[in-house]
Design a protein with these regions (language model features):
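Accessory nucleic-acid engagement/destabilization modules that flank
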Residues: 1-174
Length: 174
């Protein structure tokens, strides 16, 4: 981090050097998690018959073309990270990685929560296939935690708003 960020920026993020490095690594690994959804993979796999056949052993990859625009991958990344209980600040950095922060309502509308279904769940998994997609997310998320030096989601830092903005800028420029 010393090479990429001036001391003044690192101070405003308010994480010690090691935790900042771990956090930046984690964000680099999870910011595109929204691409692990039927909404994103379906159209790509339509052009790749061999990988599609392998994936179709686990999922139908069905999606609704007219609904894809409601779950762009940056928004989907934030929604999935929140679904996985990632701290909201870190999830919002992933959601803003193309320079546009997401609104809380838009994020909530994606997958909802334990008490309420989201409006766009069909963009994330075909009917009856939620467990498959959740297991994919969990595996990628756990890998990112491990590779970044965190042993659990509980070790991830809570960020201040200035830290979120600065880390989003770092992620955008990376």
């Amino acid at each position: 981090m010393q090479r990429w960020l001036p001391e003044s920026v690192r101070q405003h993020i308010e994480l010690d050097e090691d935790l900042l490095t771990q956090t930046a690594c984690f964000l680099g690994l999870v910011h595109d998690l929204g691409k692990a959804s039927t909404n994103f993979q379906g159209p790509i796999m339509a052009q790749l018959p061999e990988p599609r056949q392998c994936l179709e052993k686990y999922t139908t990859l069905s999606y609704r073309e007219q609904n894809r625009k409601y779950s762009r991958h940056a928004l989907a990344s934030e929604a999935i990270l929140r679904w996985l209980k990632c701290p909201n600040g870190l999830a919002s950095v992933a959601g803003a990685h193309h320079g546009k922060p997401q609104t809380g309502k838009d994020v909530f509308d994606q997958l909802g929560d334990e008490e309420e279904e989201g409006s766009w769940e069909s963009n994330y998994w075909p009917e009856g296939e939620q467990k498959f997609w959740e297991s994919c997310w969990r595996e990628l998320f756990d890998y990112a935690l491990q590779e970044s030096g965190f042993s659990s989601v509980d070790e991830l830092p809570q960020l201040t708003i200035p830290a979120e903005i600065l880390l989003a800028g770092l992620l955008i420029m990376a």
